[in-house]
Amino acid sequence: MSIADRAATSPAAGAADAGARGAASVPAAPAGAIALPLTGERELRLDLFRGLALWLIFIDHLPPSLITWFTIRNYGFSDATEIFIFISGYTAAFVYGRAMLERGLVVATARILRRAWQIYVAHVFLFTIFLAEITYVATSFENPLYTEEMGIMDFLKQPDVTIVQALLLRFRPANMDVLPLYIVLMLSLPLVLVLMRWKPDLTLALSVLLYAVTWEYDLYLSSYPNGFWAFNPLAWQLLFVFGAWCALGGARRMQKILSSPVTLAVCFAYLFFSFLVTLTWYVPQLGHLMPRRIEQWMYPIDKTDLDVLRFAHFLALAAITVYYLPRDWPPLKSPWLKPLILCGQHSLEIFCLGVFLAFAGHFILAEVGGGAALHALITLSGILIMCGMAWLISWYKHVADKSASRKGAGGNADMAGGG
């Protein structure tokens, strides 16, 4: 179940301040920013874009080809990871902020810790299955390069030591860095919600301060056997906290700014600038057009510590998206977008499946070869499997909920943060 599942039927009282509880009385902007849904209304845009992020992450994990050119990382500074973390912060704050208001800090914290434990168990399960998949392929096809490429050589050399480091989230194979980040961010959520309920703007300012200190003093979490986390939680917390701030009234208060022609013009200009910069990465002949001083100031654009250029690129994309795609955008009810929305509603399960499928696709492409046609077939097959799994989970949950309602049992609020 995705984090947004319980938000589907949650009232506007889910906000952590009195202003958000009065959201129903605030007139909507032409296509205003994502804000707390009204009673009985689901914010399908969150599900849609988290589902899109999962598809893009899956495609980005496959070997480069013509298909990978359709992902957003090739046209700007940010990628699908920013989308996923922001929406996770938004929906988690909405669901557990409501729980904190209605049931108190202790109950809300217990539910958050339960959800963090569920994500941790999913990560360990994925680690086990993923490790077995890589080892089986490398052994069966007598190609040890798979173990080296996917980063499990240290595990095979010292399994007794490495398994402990894996349980401590310090050792991870390739493509398994998102869930550990998510776990740490969820563990910080009780403190974030307490501060948000007290002073939301100050909380966001403290998050910015931590981000700045992380950059200034090069703070990071170490990994095993050497190096550091691919996604530094001390930096990426800014995007998560910003999502929480938006969910608890910040987005609603920013509606006038976001709908301003000046804001939109600045966003479009920045997106165009970032597109021109990324163009020089793939067309070397254009490299001379980039002024040397700008290059020295801008590079490297660090993903590990969420470079400010990446953060700004995501903000520009988000501002334009929420302006031109209102909450009542008709295609949101279209059957054509239903697969994306279903994937977004069950994001934990679909992410884990996507990691498994990405290596399977990588293996097929490496062993069989082939061009764009085979790559497209593998990509489409993987996405169809992800959609099928999302539909199956949704169907099972629907049947289980109907059975529970017949017995007079209520929904499991502890699963609200799922996915």
Labelled PLM ranges:
Residues 2-419:
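Alpha-helical transmembrane segments and their immediate juxtamembrane cytosolic regions
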